[in-house]
């Protein structure tokens, strides 16, 4: 469904769209008051060859999240410390998020979890950096439950103290695989629906990885959301569960900006809440992503699957951003199905559109930043040798 008035595409629940549209209009009045969180997290699941496009090899994927966060804050600049990883095609979606966050004059808050280093730029300290990435989900023991609960409680406290609407975004190499594992742990068969940053989703590889993780986890019938995250999840999921619930307890609207990773967080929260206060909770929760990610309809099907399982009416928002007019291959690659989403590109660009900015303006600024990146040698599409 396309909203002519708002200029954005809607997907997901077919019911109560009129009510949802009114809520989106309310968001328009709060755009410049939004608090954007970028949660960058590490999972050793990303080290599996062929699992992610967030860096061309395992070594580069270790710094992808840090480089994305740095670029989100600074844009194209000569004083970058973390080198953006080489990609087979496209360019980091942090480019889109940087441009659009600057347009709406919002400075993102970076939350590093399991990265292993303390970033030099401003960030929120949530846990000891020495904890490092979560284990590969194939172990069935991604994290201790103590760590999961600590991350959840920290997120909950931050969310409950929020005095403004929040947008949650992520950069988690390997995160779509942990998202799939979480959803399948709760009985959803989603291997053909979960997207990927890769041009062609590694569905068979992910299926085997998830299957091995769930087998080793050996979850019993009485497991809960925290058990699942501890078994096959990642730090982002634990923290974001708390952040989302806390913000809603503070009666703040929440935009979850991303794809399957955000739907995994929603599912974990719905499982945790049960029927109690479910309707009040989801009333002002929005899933936001790019138009490129919803092109093949898989994300729409995935959202509807969750709506059906939990008798919910979640609505998705798809950004109208496109690079069809771009003169650069790196941006045109998005139109061909490369990269698609990440670093909150969909949700943050939607905020820019709702604030009155046009596609032409966003594309122009993306191209300007890309030109600077090329001049500084910050972008490379060379293939790994």
From Swiss-Prot:
Listed GO MF terms: nicotinate-nucleotide-dimethylbenzimidazole phosphoribosyltransferase activity
Listed transmembrane segments: none
Entries under CDD domains matching the protein: DMB-PRT_CobT
A Pfam cross-reference name: DBI_PRT
Disulfide bond entries: none
InterPro entries in the record: Nict_dMeBzImd_PRibTrfase, Nict_dMeBzImd_PRibTrfase_arc, Nict_dMeBzImd_PRibTrfase_sf
Family: Belongs to the UPF0284 family.
Protein name (Swiss-Prot/TrEMBL): UPF0284 protein PMT9312_0438
Native source organism of the sequence: Prochlorococcus marinus (strain MIT 9312)
Lineage per the UniProt record: Bacteria, Bacillati, Cyanobacteriota, Cyanophyceae, Synechococcales
């Amino acid at each position: 469904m396309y909203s002519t008035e708002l200029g954005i595409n809607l997907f997901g629940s077919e019911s109560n769209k009129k009510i949802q549209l009114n809520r989106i209009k309310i968001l328009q009045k709060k755009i410049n008051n939004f608090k954007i969180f970028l949660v960058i997290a590490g999972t050793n699941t990303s080290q599996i060859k062929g699992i992610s496009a967030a860096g061309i090899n395992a070594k580069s994927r270790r710094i992808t999240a840090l480089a994305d966060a740095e670029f989100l804050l600074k844009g194209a600049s000569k004083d970058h410390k973390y080198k953006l990883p080489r990609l087979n095609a496209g360019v980091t979606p942090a480019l889109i998020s940087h441009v659009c966050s600057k347009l709406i004059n919002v400075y993102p808050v970076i939350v590093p979890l399991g990265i292993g280093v303390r970033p030099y730029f401003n960030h929120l300290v949530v846990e000891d950096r020495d904890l490092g990435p979560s284990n590969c989900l194939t172990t069935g023991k991604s994290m201790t439950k103590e760590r999961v609960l600590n991350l959840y409680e920290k997120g909950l406290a931050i969310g409950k103290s929020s005095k403004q609407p929040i947008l949650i975004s992520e950069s988690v190499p390997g995160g779509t695989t942990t998202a799939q594992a979480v959803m399948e742990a709760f009985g959803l068969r989603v291997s053909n629906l979960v997207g990927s940053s890769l041009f062609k989703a590694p569905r068979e590889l992910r299926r085997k990885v998830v299957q091995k993780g769930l087998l080793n986890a050996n979850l019993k019938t009485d497991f809960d959301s925290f058990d699942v995250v501890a078994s096959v999840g990642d730090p982002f999921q634990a923290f974001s569960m708390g952040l989302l619930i806390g913000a809603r307890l503070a009666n703040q609207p929440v935009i979850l900006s991303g794809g399957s990773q955000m739907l995994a967080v929603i599912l974990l929260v719905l499982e945790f809440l049960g029927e109690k206060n479910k309707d009040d909770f989801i009333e002002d929760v929005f899933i936001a992503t790019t138009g490129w990610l919803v092109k093949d309809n898989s994300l729409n099907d995935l959202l509807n699957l969750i709506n059906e399982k939990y008798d919910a009416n979640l609505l998705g928002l798809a950004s109208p951003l496109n690079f069809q007019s771009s003169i650069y291959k790196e941006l045109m690659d998005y139109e061909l199905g490369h990269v698609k989403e990440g670093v909150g590109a969909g949700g943050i660009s939607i905020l820019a559109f709702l604030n009155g900015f046009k596609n032409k303006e966003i594309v122009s600024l993306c191209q300007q930043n890309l030109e600077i990146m090329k001049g500084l040698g910050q972008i490379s599409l060379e293939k790994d040798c």
